[in-house]
UniProtKB/Swiss-Prot annotation:
GO molecular function, one term: structural constituent of ribosome
SUPFAM superfamilies: Ribosomal protein L30p/L7e
Organism: Rickettsia akari (strain Hartford)
Keyword match Ribonucleoprotein: yes
Xref: PANTHER family: LARGE RIBOSOMAL SUBUNIT PROTEIN UL30M, MITOCHONDRIAL RIBOSOMAL PROTEIN L30
Any matching Pfam family: Ribosomal_L30
Stated name of the protein: Large ribosomal subunit protein uL30
Family: Belongs to the universal ribosomal protein uL30 family.
GO biological process, one term: translation
Binding partners and assembly: Part of the 50S ribosomal subunit.
Entry GO terms, CC: cytosolic large ribosomal subunit
InterPro entries in alphabetical order: Ribo_uL30_ferredoxin-like_sf, Ribosomal_uL30_bac-type, Ribosomal_uL30_ferredoxin-like
Length: 63
């Protein structure tokens, strides 16, 4: 049994300027508020949904 939790590294590569307000709030919810900032998060369904909403602003890597 593999107990390793899958993590993903998310990097903001585009600005949220000019995008909808709820997309900016989603970035803040992911812990991203500046360009080229990266966070490592657990790969859960809620995180996947948030990432899917703003995927055009992000670079996503599996860890």
């Amino acid at each position: 049994m593999n107990n390793k939790i899958n993590n993903i590294k998310i990097t903001q590569v585009k600005s949220a300027i000019g995008h909808k307000y709820d997309q900016r709030l989603t970035l803040i919810g992911l812990g991203l508020n500046k360009m080229n900032k990266s966070v490592i998060l657990e790969n859960t369904n809620s995180i996947k949904g948030m990432v899917n909403k703003v995927k055009h602003l992000l670079k996503i890597e599996n860890m």
